[in-house]
């Protein structure tokens, strides 16, 4: 399906590698997410009609609210390239939220993060969950997976080898063998 059809279905995603517009400001990056659902014509934008001005003001207000909700409002005028890595990840998720999605697909959001950034990300994802978002997480950092997931599906070479609650998956012999090389004692802490 076309990307706009997926977004209209309420689904948005982030990628393992950060895909921000690094030479644009934080606010502008979030605004990009709002433009998938534009309600004005090309001519409205070209001539900056009252309709265009009203809708753009609403989108800007919404983008600022999203930045407030994730703690990046104070960075709205900074360039994305100047944000620390963890904040760039948050910004990418904020842009996904700006599309209006309720299902967020996060591909390796903790990749490249230190422990402090990973913990901050976990808290952020919990906040999203509490706000009614559904998060589908693809992640190899087992501490992140075990600390954030309600339910886990484990895939090994394209085949599902386990599913269940974190405590059950952590002790599943097939999971231990596939992801931890057969070291079963205290496999996931």
Regions found by a protein language model. Name each.
Residues 1-189:
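Glycine-rich phosphate-binding loops of nucleotide-dependent enzymes
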């Amino acid at each position: 399906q076309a990307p706009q059809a997926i977004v209209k279905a309420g689904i948005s995603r982030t990628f393992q590698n950060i895909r921000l517009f690094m030479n644009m400001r934080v606010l502008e990056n979030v605004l990009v997410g709002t433009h998938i659902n534009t309600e004005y014509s090309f001519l409205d934008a070209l001539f900056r009609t009252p309709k265009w001005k009203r809708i753009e003001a609403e989108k800007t207000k919404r983008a600022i609210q999203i930045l407030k909700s994730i703690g990046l409002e104070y960075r709205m005028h900074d360039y994305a390239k100047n944000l620390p890595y963890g904040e760039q990840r948050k910004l990418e998720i904020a842009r996904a939220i700006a599309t209006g999605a309720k299902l967020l697909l996060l591909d390796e959001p903790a990749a490249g993060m230190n422990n402090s950034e990973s913990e901050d990300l976990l808290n952020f994802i919990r906040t999203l969950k509490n706000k009614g978002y559904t998060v589908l997480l693809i992640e190899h950092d087992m501490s992140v997976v075990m600390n954030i997931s309600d339910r886990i599906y484990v895939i090994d070479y394209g085949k599902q080898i386990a599913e269940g609650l974190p405590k059950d998956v952590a002790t599943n012999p097939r999971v231990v063998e596939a992801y931890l090389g057969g070291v079963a004692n205290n496999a996931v802490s």
